[in-house]
């Protein structure tokens, strides 16, 4: 399953979020990926807890985001 967060960010802010996604995924030893979506960029993780940690980073950085239902 993949747990995704769609963020509305671009430029340096998006680069920063990519770095944070890498860091939280590396710490949890799981895979992740980012892909463009109609409403922004989706960051998808293999673990719901990592998605929650990434959402906390978005809140801290004041980035607009939405979570998606898990996909297989």
Feature-to-residue mapping (PLM):
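Short glycine-/aliphatic-rich beta-strand segments at the starts of folded cytosolic domains
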Residues: 1-11
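Conserved short beta-strand edge segments in small beta-sheet-based binding/regulatory domains
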Residues: 30-34, 61-72
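Generic recognition of long tandem-repeat/solenoid scaffolds
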Residues: 5-7, 41-44
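Short amphipathic alpha-helices in soluble, non-transmembrane regions
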Residues: 17-24, 53-62
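Short glycine-enriched loop/turn motifs at secondary-structure junctions
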Residues: 1, 34-39
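Helix N-cap motif at beta-to-alpha junctions
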Residues: 11, 44-52
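Short, glycine- and small/hydrophobic-rich beta-strand elements in well-ordered beta-sheets
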Residues: 20-36
